[in-house]
């Protein structure tokens, strides 16, 4: 699977399927029970996509895919947060029935969980971005808090994801027995000679160079006659 196919697959994962929102019904909130079943389906899709990404064994490709995917994920999260706050949707209330609000609710829950998966499976790449982005930090703190109150993550196989993510990112203090289940290297500091870090630096330099070239091309052009004046 090439880069474009991967990006197309991940972009679909950032948005909830219409079958999820269409199936929700409320009566003393059985909608939550129904949503949790649909959430399970979405989670299987997300985890399969990440498994395929991990099997690429190409740091540069993984970097490019996660670069695009993370930016898209946080844009969706930010837009959905705005919608929910504007409508005074409470996370511990019933699952919203308005189509727009249901979508926003699903976006927050599913993308927060998905980001947790990415954090735990690709911690070095995520820290490379996240640790210097205060806006992402604020958004994911809000997302974790929102999700913790929805009841979606109560019990079940996905209940630990929010806590593990918060500890890995340093949002909450690490438990004495904390261990990222997907991290093979448990050292606190990554040596500068680490080949992964080297690849990240090279990719970052290449990306910045490309951005500078684009800026130069966009800049105003001075004609020869103007430059001679």
Swiss-Prot record:
GO cellular component term of the entry, any: endoplasmic reticulum lumen
Protein task: Molecular adapter required to prevent protein hyperglycosylation of HSP90B1: during translation, associates with nascent HSP90B1 and the STT3A catalytic component of the OST-A complex and tethers them to a specialized translocon that forms a microenvironment for HSP90B1 folding. In the CCDC134-containing translocon, STT3A associates with the SRT pseudosubstrate motif of HSP90B1, preventing access to facultative glycosylation sites until folding is completed, preventing hyperglycosylation and subsequent degradation of HSP90B1.
Lipoprotein in keyword set: no
Family: Belongs to the CCDC134 family.
Key words, A-Z: Coiled coil, Cytoplasm, Endoplasmic reticulum, Glycoprotein, Nucleus, Secreted, Signal
Subcellular location: Endoplasmic reticulum lumen; Secreted; Cytoplasm; Nucleus
Pfam families according to UniProt: ERK-JNK_inhib
GO biological process, one term: positive regulation of Wnt signaling pathway
Tagged with keyword Secreted: yes
Disordered: annotated span: 182-229
InterPro entries, per the entry: Coiled-coil_dom_con_pro_134 (IPR026321)
Domain of life (superkingdom): Eukaryota
Signal sequence residues: 1-22
Originating species: Mus musculus (Mouse)
A GO molecular-function annotation: protein-macromolecule adaptor activity
Record-given protein name: Coiled-coil domain-containing protein 134
Glycan-carrying positions: 148
Motif Prevents secretion from ER, chain ranges: 226-229
